[in-house]
Structure formats: structure tokens, C-alpha cells
Amino acid sequence: MLTIYRRDTVNKLRQQLQTEEKIPERRTMNEKQRTYYCIDMKTFYASVECAERHLNPFETNLVVADLTRGSNALCLAITPRMKAQGIKNRCRLSDIPKSVKYEVAPPRMALYIEYAANIYSLYLDYFDPQDIHVYSIDESFIDVTDYLPLFHKDKYELAKFLMNEIADRYHIPSTAGIGTNLYLAKIALDITAKHARDHIGFLDEELYKQTLWDHRPITDFWMVAAGTARRLERFGVYDMRGITRMPTDTMYRTFGKNAELLIDHAWGREPCLISDIKNYKSKSHSVSFSQILPRDYSCKEARTVIHEMTLNGAAELMKRKVITNKVGIFVGYTHDERAPTKGMAKLDVTTNLASFLVEAAMRLYDRTTDPVTPIRRLGIAFEDVCDEGCEGYNLFTDWDAVERERSLQHTMLDINQRFGKNAILSGINYMPEGTQRERNGFIGGHRAGYDDKNGKS
């Protein structure tokens, strides 16, 4: 039976253990082998919807998808029961066989975030936040090295206990990967745990070499994308063993600085610790937005959306109290009929005021976008953002106009923060092709579902 320690006692117990065993609080990997968990919630969105309906996801055919996007809508998640029938998790509604009967749940991103926060809170009942890295909404890494002796359990028993806790409290099934470094924990989750009856996989460096060096396809491995696999194929390499046999200079010539990552991972090595992740600070900063349009848009219609996205970006910059002098645009076309177009414009001012940013974005869009080919994807980025204290304008700037616009933009931001993003809008948002009014109710590009507690849209 596992003794349950709440978060307010964990630190005291760890200090006691360190005193008794003379263990320093932090060690490098060379001093002591560490044990990491990578815990993933199975088909998270679908499992949450089943939990809300008091259904068993292993016995229920349920899909999370936005029916307002038509029969070709992307399935954000399907239940394990549907996956067991050979249906792919990220399929489209039209891909599901007609013979399969299923329930469709509209996305409720706010609800999923609430569940994720509750699960993180559960972790905090047993672990220090410095030992937890949240990788995504449904996946987290935990360094349990110092907790195994604390709880008097081995790595399997503690993992099973956590999985049972999540299931008992929130009715969400989970899977766990255990590894001697972060990479091996992730691979144990993604590959090994799938074949384990208890949904727990374990890998150390030797076991990794014995069981996965010849595993194919190589794209099953974390951080190996299809493009990387294609470049490896040119050298006759199709698995991790093949990477270990490639000349180092060839690897660096082909993959640049990413070669070091590929080589380390091929050997099952990963020197990065959770503390390194938490201490990392990016040298450059940007704010970006992207969206997939609900249908094919003409160049003129998409221009309206870029205008909206720029206004939204200006508000976000002001909210974060940062400014920029670089605007970038990305345009993707229907069915990849032609290569995407993109460009970057440098302003002669450093600002977060919409008038300057919209003017630059519209000029850039008109200069770089194909006026004929239908458009389906749009993106905008504000690069090299910095603190508002660095704001700068040129000699010809109308300072009275700048102050009026800044005051108006602040007022609109305050109103929208208090009463909702649609409380006050610009005229462009009421154009029929505009998307911002609807997207203001989205989280991560999907419906938030704030008023959807019963799963009704």
C-alpha cells in the first residue's frame, strides 16, 4: 500500500531522506542514474467527453469533431474502442467507415484545459513542480528519481499508482513510459508501452539497443520527421542502428547542428534534464498566429482575414507590453496547387500600434501573394519583439495621432478583457469572409465550449 504524501509535506520528507542517506539535492546524470516518467492521457479529448457522459472509452464509439466544418472535418480525437477497429486517430469524419456507428462530440477546449489542470494538480500532490515538465495538454515528464525511495516503491509500482489515481479521480485512462533519460521515457511511451498489457513501457540504453535499434519505420521515433527520414534513405539508412553507423562528418554535413541530436538519440542518449528545460531562455522572441480557412478563399477574401489577424496581433502585442519592427506573412494554397508564399517586411518604426502594422502587412500581402490560386492557410508573425520601453518612431511621425491611437487601442483591449473578445470589434470583422468573430470563441483553433457543459453546441 502506497503512503500518500500531500504537496506540503513532500519537501520536508525529501530533506529528511537526503539527510539520512547523505544524498545531494541535485546530481548530474554521471553521478546517479535517473528515472523519468512520461505519462500520456489516452485519446485525451475523447476520454474527457466519455467521462462527462459517464461512458467507458474502451466500450464507446465517440469522435471529437466540429460538425459545423462539414463531413470533411478533422477528428481531434477518437476513443480507444474506435482505434481498436483500425480507425486512425487524426482522420477526417469522411474517412470513418459507414458501417461504424459513433457519437460526435463538439470540441470543448476550455473543459479539456480544466481537466489537464486538475491532473497537473494531482501530480503536485506527490511531486515538486521543479521535477515536472508539462510537454503538452495531455502529456507530462516527471523526474521520480528521489521519490522512489521516498515512497518505498519501485518504478513500476509508482507509475501504476499514478495511473490509477488519474483514473479514479477523473476517469481518464493513461499510459506511461519509464526511462533512464527523458528521450528513453518518451520512446518507452510512444513505442514500448503500446505493446504492454499494463500500458507501462520501460527502456534503458541497453534495452533500447536490443529492442528498438532495428525498429521501422524510423518516423515512429520522437523528433524524426518524414523529411529527416527521406534524407536518411539517400544513405540507405532506415533505422536507428543505421544512424549509429553513418560517418559523423556526413551526419553534420546533411543535418547541421541537428546531427548531434540524431546521433545521441540513435544511441539512446539524452543529456538534457528537466532543470535544463526550466532554465532555458530563448535568445529571440516572436508572436505568431495561423489558421486554416473554412473553405477556399480568393486573394481578396484572404486579404480581409490577414487584416483581421494583424489587428488581433497588435492587440496581443499591447497586452504583452511588447513591440516589433518586423512583420512576416505565410500563405498556403488549396490542395498544395502551388508552393506556399511568404515574406518578411521591416518597418521604419518599432511599435505595437495597429495602423503601422496593418499598413506593412497589407503591402507585404499584396506583393507576395498569388492573386489567382485559391487560398486555404494563413499565418502572420511579429519577429524580434522587445519591451515597450524600446518604442521608436521616425521624424515624420504625428505624435498626437500616435497618442490617440494608443489610447483607443488600450481602451478596446480593456473592454475586450473585461467583457469578452467580441464586446467591441473593428468594422473589418463584420465582413462576410471575416473569421475573427467566430475564432474569438476558440482556444487553440478549436471551439472553447464555455457554454457546452452538456456537450451541446
Features from the language model and the residues they span:
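Residues that scaffold, gate, or flank divalent-cation-dependent active/transport sites
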Residues: 2-137, 141, 266
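Acidic, metal-coordinating catalytic segment for phosphate/diphosphate chemistry
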Residues: 10, 48, 343, 347-457
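DNA-contacting surface of Y-family translesion DNA polymerases
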Residues: 38, 230-374
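Short acidic, glycine/serine/threonine-rich loops at helix termini
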Residues: 48-50, 74-77, 184-192, 234, ...
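Short Gly/Ser/Thr- and Asp/Glu-enriched loop/turn motifs at secondary-structure junctions
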Residues: 135-139, 179-182, 322-326, 373-377
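Catalytic palm subdomain of template-directed nucleic-acid polymerases
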Residues: 142-163, 192, 236
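Long, highly charged, low-complexity intrinsically disordered interaction regions
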Residues: 158-216
